[in-house]
Amino acid sequence: MAKGIKEMKKDLEQAMFEDLGRCHFWTELAEYHGLLDFISYHSDMLDDYTKEIHTDPALLWIPSTSKVRYEPLGVALIMGSWNFPYFVTLKPLAMAILTGNCAIIKPSELGPCCAKVIQIIVEKYLDKRCFRVIQG
């Protein structure tokens, strides 16, 4: 997904300008770099998120062992907002991807150009069996 965001930077900025009148500088600062930094940081932390955690068992169960294993829960529904359409929509999508979940993405209908760019990124760069965008 980060690759798609980088490749579609100009489209992201143009759609934001058409929908909200937001200048390219602010879009790049608040949405583009913030999102890429978020994805980069959490991608680096993936091993910490997925490793088993061994804990001390309850007194009743000694000498057994206890551990916590994190597993995907299923499908996430991500509802986007109109004021920060990329960050608020693609940030939870990145976390769904990193945690192994599928997602249904519903961008805001108040920003149709941004919603279309989100749909292009999802359809072009992510697995169509796991991630769907619903417009409207």
Question: Positions of the model-derived regions?
Answer:
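N-terminal Rossmann-like NAD(P)+-binding subdomain of aldehyde/semialdehyde dehydrogenases
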Residues: 1-64
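Rossmann-like NAD(P) dinucleotide-binding subdomain of oxidoreductase/dehydrogenase enzymes
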Residues: 56-136
